[in-house]
Amino acid sequence: MEEENEVVKTFAELGVREELVKACERLGWKNPSKIQAEALPFALEGKDVIGLAQTGSGKTGAFAIPILQALLEYVYDSEPKKGRRPDPAFFACVLSPTRELAIQIAEQFEALGADISLRCAVLVGGIDRMQQTIALGKRPHVIVATPGRLWDHMSDTKGFSLKSLKYLVLDEADRLLNEDFEKSLNQILEEIPLERKTFLFSATMTKKVRKLQRACLRNPVKIEAASKYSTVDTLKQQYRFVAAKYKDCYLVYILSEMPESTSMIFTRTCDGTRFLALVLRSLGFRAIPISGQMTQSKRLGALNKFKAGECNILVCTDVASRGLDIPSVDVVINYDIPTNSKDYIHRVGRTARAGRSGVGISLVNQYELEWYIQIEKLIGKKLPEYPAEEDEVLSLLERVAEAKKLSAMNMKESGGRKRRGEDDEESERFLGGNKDRGNKERGGNKDKKSSKKFKR
């Protein structure tokens, strides 16, 4: 049995059409991930599927490929009626708990469907509804939406209906039911056809998810691609116990040890992300914040700059810890230990994705020790300590203190908590005119320590 499990089938061997196999190859998907290998055969047969999979497991492909294959068969393999192919508009709908995740899912659909003229629309809050109405007027094959905005259009947009829907996807269903979407979700389910295929994907199987499963799936096949709370084997996890007053020094030390790496740093509050990003910028690091306080356009702008390499450090709250498809994240640093240990799993899930290696480092102060102990209990392992030269760390104290002082003054001058919708001028100045500043200010450290990258 173990030998059978070790055999990795190709997408073609799983029954995926040649057009989509080529699309997978273009995306660098050489072989199916575990969730794809287990879910695709059933999904391609037309069965309802429940997939329990961790972040970064490739679950988007597990539902996008069957939908696109069914769309191809519906258009090209069905008998034409009165000389015309059936209209495949509003063929599938994917519901997502966040705007960012919806946009990422749509991007993957468009990449996979590039050769088949796929039409895809995104319906999320924070984006002009008139633009979305125009997109719906083009009769997209696939809609990716948050439940609230989708229901707004179903209620108010003239001529829009999902009566012809063939596929429904509930992605990150545990979060869909935990973020005040339950009412909108129930309204949507009452309006769409009962005769449809449904895919439900979730990180955990909660009571609410089970209830949703019973309500909207028919004889589903359950695929569990990971243990309930686990981290991938390619993730190197470490911690460092530090006094609270020295935590910033340790953070700067760690970032200086790996200057070319892409990093995500998690803080507990929105103000904390902005303050820490300001501190790091003043020390020459290319950091940018993202949090729920920012407008949608600013959040997407920050993500795009991070993806494009204009900055290599993203300072974020847990709003960014799930669902963001950011490639090549090398390091995740828990600057603030999460009070909910399950959030740790989602945070470190930003690295070591799709078979790549990655590092997760937690900075634990004396007030966070109990939370950290709960994390180790959850993942079932004791983590090794991140080795650091204490003398080198403490030598940063004066520079870090000065940077914190300047950043606090900057925050105070701009009114502390930025008003929602206000431009992040510091980000624009930093990214627009000081791209080389980090390397210049840290020049000595870069040559000295870049060779140590990931040896820890």
Curated annotation (Swiss-Prot):
Catalytic activities: ATP + H2O = ADP + phosphate + H(+)
Comp. bias regions, Basic and acidic residues: 434-448
Gene Ontology molecular function: any one: RNA helicase activity
Subcellular location: Nucleus; Nucleus, Nucleolus
Region (Disordered) residue spans: 407-456
Residue span of motif Q motif: 9-37
EC number(s) on file: 3.6.4.13
Keywords tagged on the record: ATP-binding, Helicase, Hydrolase, Nucleotide-binding, Nucleus, Repressor, RNA-binding, rRNA processing, Stress response
Lineage: superkingdom: Eukaryota
CC annotations in GO: nucleolus
EC class name: hydrolase
The Helicase ATP-binding domain, residue ranges: 40-223
CDD domains registered for this protein in UniProt: DEADc_DDX47, SF2_C_DEAD
Alphabetical GO biological process terms: rRNA processing
Variant or mutagenesis effect after changing T273I: In rh10-1; temperature-sensitive mutant
Disulphide linkage map: none
Coiled-coil spans in chain: none
Sites where the protein binds ATP: A53, Q54, T55, G56, S57, G58, K59, T60
Renumbered ranges of motif DEAD box: 171-174
Gene ablation phenotype (knockout): Plants are indistinguishable from that of wild-type at 16 degrees Celsius, however they generate a weak phenotype of pointed leaves at 22 degrees Celsius which become narrower at 26 degrees Celsius. In the leaves of plants grown at 26 degrees Celsius, the xylems are located on the adaxial sides and the phloems are on the abaxial sides, similar to those in the wild type. Plants with double mutations in this protein and in AS2 or AS1 protein have abaxialized filamentous and trumpet-like leaves with loss of the adaxial domain at high temperatures.
Entry's family note: Belongs to the DEAD box helicase family. DDX47/RRP3 subfamily.
Free-text note regarding domains: The Q motif is unique to and characteristic of the DEAD box family of RNA helicases and controls ATP binding and hydrolysis.
Function statement: Involved in leaf polarity establishment by functioning cooperatively with AS2 to repress abaxial genes ARF3, ARF4, KAN1, KAN2, YAB1 and YAB5, and the knox homeobox genes KNAT1, KNAT2, KNAT6, and STM to promote adaxial development in leaf primordia at shoot apical meristems at high temperatures. Involved in the processing of pre-rRNA intermediates at high temperatures.
Identification of the protein by name: DEAD-box ATP-dependent RNA helicase 10
Annotated source species: Arabidopsis thaliana (Mouse-ear cress)
Taxonomic placement: Eukaryota, Viridiplantae, Streptophyta, Embryophyta, Tracheophyta
